[in-house]
């Protein structure tokens, strides 16, 4: 890790800040809240922002970043911005248009990282979640290798500096890596990862291929109704995190964040509270002992908060495999 900017280098030579701010909001939250939170995060020291077309917040996030550039707080080159192509735009001919729509909303010339959001195609169209008359998602089939070639073209066109994937299992990653004529490897795989789902095998696989693991849901998310079983155990109530928080004089959230950073994982965190956003920057101020890291490893129970259950039955549903 480059400690000056708290960055790691990607396999294409670009750098990614190891702590990012996620801009997905719970349904009950007005999307305009993303603008306020992004400004708070920039003022707190965040330079890495993770978004996606399906979040419907890119116009607000872009406005916040542009206002902070205009007032001299940051420069565009100080910001690392990630967007993602949604499942309805995975046909190769739709990928660039999706990225261009995001750029239009952001009023940016480029994004720093563009990801395939899920390896599962849905019927193309205006609806993000197209359903049939029975309310079932309308699945589609697409050659993900062809989708990847369209991603490579976006990089060549200068619309994104780096390209990667999200929610891919190791077999789906291998399919891209083994693609004949591969021009660019995915720089990262963004997946759910926290002490209850530590992704040890996927992390080892990604490291062996020089692919960075980016973690979302690092504090165990309870907020996304419809996506998360609200009866799931609350990660931050885990007694081990509580006792370590006392030992290091930090919060359980900071222990969970620090755990991932020390494993070489890039961490995304979202908070709706200003004091929490600022507090999360303290993750660089302390270090967990190797003994405590082993204890945290022992919390794994392969438990997903976000199993993308609405996609179950899709031929490319990634979570059937062990990793």
UniProtKB/Swiss-Prot annotation:
Transmembrane segments: none annotated. It is found in: Cytoplasm. It holds the Pfam family Aldo_ket_red. GO terms for cellular component: cytoplasm. The active site is at residue 55. Substrate binds at residues 31, 117. Detected in kidney and brain. Its main location: cytoplasm. Keywords: Cytoplasm, Lipid metabolism, NADP, Oxidoreductase, Steroid metabolism. GO terms for molecular function: 17-beta-hydroxysteroid dehydrogenase (NADP+) activity; 5-alpha-androstane-3-beta,17-beta-diol dehydrogenase (NADP+) activity; aldo-keto reductase (NADPH) activity; androsterone dehydrogenase [NAD(P)+] activity; lithocholic acid binding; NADP+ binding; NADPH binding; steroid binding. The record marks 84 as: Lowers pKa of active site Tyr. Changing residue 31 to A: No effect on affinity for androstenedione. Slight increase of catalytic activity. It catalyses: androsterone + NADP(+) = 5alpha-androstan-3,17-dione + NADPH + H(+); androsterone + NAD(+) = 5alpha-androstan-3,17-dione + NADH + H(+). Monomer. Belongs to the aldo/keto reductase family. NADP-dependent 17-alpha-hydroxysteroid dehydrogenase that converts 5-alpha-androstane-3,17-dione into androsterone. Has lower 3-alpha-hydroxysteroid dehydrogenase activity. Has broad substrate specificity and acts on various 17-alpha-hydroxysteroids, 17-ketosteroids, 3-alpha hydroxysteroids and 3-ketosteroids. Reduction of keto groups is strictly stereoselective. Reduction of 17-ketosteroids yields only 17-alpha-hydroxysteroids. Likewise, reduction of 3-ketosteroids yields only 3-alpha-hydroxysteroids. This is Aldo-keto reductase family 1 member C21. It comes from Mus musculus. The lineage of its organism: Eukaryota, Metazoa, Chordata, Craniata, Vertebrata.
